[in-house]
Structure formats: C-alpha cells, structure tokens
Design a protein with these regions (language model features):
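Second-shell loop/turn segments in exported
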Residues: 20, 37-47, 83-88, 133-144, ...
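N-terminal hydrophobic or amphipathic helices/low-complexity stretches enriched
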Residues: 16-67, 110, 317
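Alpha-helical metal-binding/catalytic segments enriched in His/Glu/Asp
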Residues: 108, 115-116, 126-179, 297
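Solvent-exposed loop/turn segments at secondary-structure junctions
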Residues: 38-41, 60, 66-67, 82, ...
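A non-catalytic alpha/beta surface segment that caps or lines the substrate-entry region
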Residues: 42-102
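His/Asp/Glu-rich mid-to-C-terminal helical/loop segments that flank catalytic regions of hydrolases
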Residues: 160, 273-317
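Metal-dependent peptidase/peptidase-like ectodomains
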Residues: 174-272, 312
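Bacterial Sec-dependent N-terminal signal peptides
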Residues: 1-22
C-alpha cells in the first residue's frame, strides 16, 4: 500500500504542478467580505442571509460548478438557539449552498467526495457567545469565514483540473451550523444523491490560525482505509505538521455524515481565546498558513478523486 500511495503522490504532484495556485489575496478578499459589518455576523435568517447565499452561489457558478435541481440553494428551516429557558424557539428560513463537479470515470463518477464548511456565525452573540458584549457583531473570521473562503478557493482550483477527476465532488456551504449542525443534518436527510454513494466527507471549520509549528488537526482519519498514512504523508508533502487522529471524529458538520456511516475528516488549525467573541477578526488570520492548509486539502481531494483508492466506511469506537 505504501508503494501505491507514493505513486499516487508523485503522479498527482506532477499533474497539478502547472495549475494556477490558490492565493492569499483571494482568501483575504473572501474573508473580508464575509466578516464585513454589513453582514452582521452572518446570523441565520438575518436580512443579510440571502446576500451571503448569493455571494457563494455566484462564486460556485464562476468556478464552473453544476447545480442540483437547477439551483445551488437547498432551503431548510432552522430553529434558533435564543435561550435555554425558551421552550418554543423561533424558526427562520435559511439555505445550504451546493455545487457539483462531475468525475469522468464511468464507474467511479457515481462515487462522491463531499467538501464542506459552514458559512454562518453568531450575529451579535447570543447563548453561544463567550463574550459579555452581546450588542457587538461577532465577525467570525476564523469561525468560519476561513473555512468558507477555503471552500470557494479549493472548488475553483479543482474545477480547473476537472478532466483528471475520476470521482465526483460535491461542495457544500452549510447554513446554521452554530444552531446545532442544522445545515449538515438537513443535507444528509435530503441528499441530492443516495447516501451510499457519498464515500468521504471533508469538513473545514476554523482553518485560518495555523500556528508556528504548522500543526493541522484532524479527526476521523481512521474512518477510511489507509486514511492515517495518507493524511500524514500528504501533510508532510505540504510542509505541515499533521496531527492525525484515527478515532476522534470531533464536533462539527462532518459528524452528521459520520452518523450516517460515511467516512469523514474534520480539519482545523486549533482553538484560541477569540473563539465565539467579537475579537475573532480578520487581522488575526494567518493567510500564508491558510494557503498551506488549502493546498493540503486540495491535494487530498485530488489524490482520492483521481485514483481508484478504496473508500470504505470504518466505524470508530
């Protein structure tokens, strides 16, 4: 298996060498828009929600992603966490944003890798805030404008080499993650393709604060064959120090997929004291580090989508 993985790495690195790269400028532009005060902390059901969905949809279209059912939008109703003391919680309409890159292998094109990130945040705080400044916009630069920006940039780069893909790739910007993984729960209950055809879900939640040790953390690497080896080797190739957990799945949108017996990887660059506060701002994002993380995740998806590497769910204790 090690020889197979090495061959895959060499082939894929040569294949993508001449492609245009993800840039820190593009990542900055996305995060700058998402964290702008006019977006009011990206709260589900807010007046800016449609604008965010339109922005992501437009970027998917510009990258050449296909629609499901003639739309990038998947509408659902989110029950908001306003207070633990409120019995009947308010409900609002919001959306997941979904795009597709079709693979080219007659058989493997019916197997899908899902790349996802939630685009919502806390608005002005609420019960999930760690701050007492509940009248202040929580911009959520790392959580999770960083993951949303990564999603858009990786989608664009993969689209440019679509002809080399065997498996298909679904890209999802989830809504209402902060309200209890509601967007991803809705997706797996209303998947545009049969769940049995979803072979791996990679989730990016807080990928913008790479530390000096260049540690990228992930859970779920043991949920598919040779996952730990593959992620460790690809991480080193990317110049990162991957902290690979086999059985610790984590607690973000990928958990909704794991509960449906779908292999997962949950990617993040670690926690920090600005988490869920108004201080999670764009000036603290490590853009060079986020680019490295994006390149790593891009290479992971390309390696698995352009080969016949077996993807089978392995439950973890």
């Amino acid at each position: 298996m090690r020889k197979i993985l090495c061959s895959l790495l060499l082939f894929n690195l040569c294949s993508v060498f001449s492609q245009s790269e993800i840039t820190t400028d593009e990542l900055y532009d996305h995060i700058s828009f998402l964290t702008s005060t006019v977006n009011k902390g990206r709260y589900p059901g807010s007046s800016t929600n449609k604008k965010l969905v339109k922005y992501i949809s437009k970027d998917f279209k510009n990258s050449g992603l296909e629609k499901f059912d003639q739309s990038y939008r998947q509408e659902f109703v989110a029950e908001l966490r306003v207070s633990k003391y409120v019995d009947k919680k308010p409900e609002v309409k919001t959306w997941n944003v979904i795009g597709l890159l079709k693979g080219n292998d007659p058989k493997l094109q019916n197997e899908y890798i899902v790349l996802g990130a939630h685009y919502d945040h806390l608005g002005h705080g609420g019960p999930s805030s760690k701050s007492d400044q509940l009248d202040t916009v929580h911009p959520g630069a790392d959580d999770n404008a960083s993951g949303t920006a990564a999603l858009l940039e990786i989608a664009e780069r993969l689209s440019s080499i679509q002809s080399q893909l065997k498996r298909s790739i679904i890209f999802v910007a989830f809504g209402a993650e902060e309200q209890g993984l509601l967007g991803s729960k809705h997706f797996v209950e209303n998947s545009p393709v049969p769940l049995a055809q979803l072979k791996l879900m990679i989730n990016m939640d807080m990928v913008g604060r790479l530390n000096e040790q260049k540690q990228i953390y992930m859970g779920g690497a043991g949920t598919f064959p040779e996952g730990q080896k593959l992620m460790a080797e690809l991480g080193k190739e990317a110049g990162l120090n991957p902290v690979v957990h086999a059985g610790s799945v984590g607690g973000s949108d990928h958990v909704s997929f794991y509960k449906k017996n779908i292999s997962v990887l949950g990617m993040h660059t670690g926690g920090h004291k600005q988490y869920h506060t108004p201080e999670d701002t764009i000036d603290l994002i490590n853009f060079n580090g986020e680019k490295m993380v994006c390149d790593y995740i891009f290479q992971t998806i390309f390696t698995l989508a352009s080969s016949a590497h077996r993807l089978k769910f392995i439950a973890q204790d």
